[in-house]
Amino acid sequence: PVTIEDQGSFMAGGVTITAPGVYKDSEPTNYDGETLHGDAAYVFWQRPVNARKNALIFLHGYGQSGKTWETTPDGRDGFQNIFLAKGWATYIVDEPRRGRAGQSTVPAELKAQPQDQLWFNNFRIGQYPIIFDGMAFPRDEESLRQFFHQMTPDTGKFDVEVVAKAMEAVIDHTGDNVLITHSAGGGPGWLAA
C-alpha cells in the first residue's frame, strides 16, 4: 500500500477576459463588464512519503482527461498508482477546455456524436468489435463500457498553444519534474518542456 504524505489540486495557467461595458451588481443577468477566467489546466496531485526528487506530470491525449492515467477500464492500477507506489509524486492534468478544466474562453458546440467505434479503432484496441490478438485490453463488456464512458468532449476548440501555456504553468508550479504525454498531448508537451 501507498502512504500519501500530501495531496491536493490546483488550476494552472489560463487567461481572464472581460466583457465590454460596465458591471452593475444590481443587474445580475446583465453581463456587461463581467470577467471570465478560462483556459486553465486542472491538476490533481499526490506525493507519497519519502518521494523521489522529480515529480511526474501526466498529460492525456485527444478525447481524454486525467482519468486516462488513474486506472485501467477493468479497475487495475494505472500509471498514477503504479508510480506512486514506486515513490514518485504524480500530477494528473486535465488540459484546458476538457474535463475538469472545461471553462473555455471560446465558444464551442457540443454534439452528442456517436463515435465509440472510432475510439476503439483509433486506440488500436482492434477493428471494432474484434480485439487484436496479444492485447492486454480486457475482453469483458463492463471494461469496454468503462473505456467508452471515459471519453471526454472539448468545451472549446483544441489549441496547442493554449494547452502548452497551461502546461508551462503546471511545470513551473511543480518544480523538478518529468513530463509524460500521450498521443495528442505530445505537441503541447514539447512546446512546454
Pin down the residues of each PLM region.
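N-terminal cap/lid segment of alpha/beta-hydrolase-fold proteins
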Residues: 1-51
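Short beta-strand element of the alpha/beta-hydrolase
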Residues: 53-61
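Active-site glycine-rich loops that stabilize anionic/oxyanionic intermediates
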Residues: 60-72
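Conserved alpha/beta-hydrolase
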Residues: 76-102
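Acidic/polar short surface loop at catalytic or gating sites that assists cofactor/ion binding
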Residues: 101-157
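Conserved acidic catalytic loop of the alpha/beta-hydrolase fold
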Residues: 157-177
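Gly/Ala-rich beta-loop-alpha elbow adjacent to hydrolase catalytic centers
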Residues: 180-189
